[in-house]
From Swiss-Prot:
Gene Ontology biological process terms from the UniProt entry: chromosome condensation
Protein name: DNA-binding protein HU-beta 2
Entries under InterPro entries matching the protein: Hist_DNA-bd, IHF-like_DNA-bd_dom_sf
Gene3D superfamilies referenced in this protein's UniProt entry, alphabetically: IHF-like DNA-binding proteins
Any GO CC annotation of this UniProt entry: cytosol
Keywords: DNA condensation, DNA-binding
Domain of life: Bacteria
Role of this protein: Histone-like DNA-binding protein which is capable of wrapping DNA to stabilize it, and thus to prevent its denaturation under extreme environmental conditions.
């Protein structure tokens, strides 16, 4: 499912206009992104938690030349699914 299909599904499920559903999806993505940038987790009880995991600086290799290089530390967005979501997916 892509973004436009998600917007249509939300519009149908919540009996909203497609425009209102699009505004909701865009606002949700914007708020979650900003919270992760600020170092906060976003938890939807039963559904899951969005969080930013910190990876340490590490050594790597340039695949083209084989030269060693340093890969900088960075944050990576992650999602941990909640129990209710896991149960729903597994039947």
């Amino acid at each position: 499912m892509n973004k436009s299909e998600l917007i249509q599904a939300i519009a149908d499920e919540a009996e909203l206009s497609k425009r209102a559903a699009a505004e909701f999806v865009n606002a949700f993505v914007s708020v979650v992104t900003q919270e992760l940038k600020d170092g906060n987790d976003v938890t939807l009880v039963g559904f899951g938690t969005f969080h930013a995991a910190q990876s340490a600086e590490r050594q790597g290799r340039n695949p083209k030349t084989g030269e060693p290089l340093t890969i900088a530390a960075r944050k990576t967005p992650k999602f941990r699914s909640g129990k209710a979501l896991k149960d729903a997916v597994n039947g």
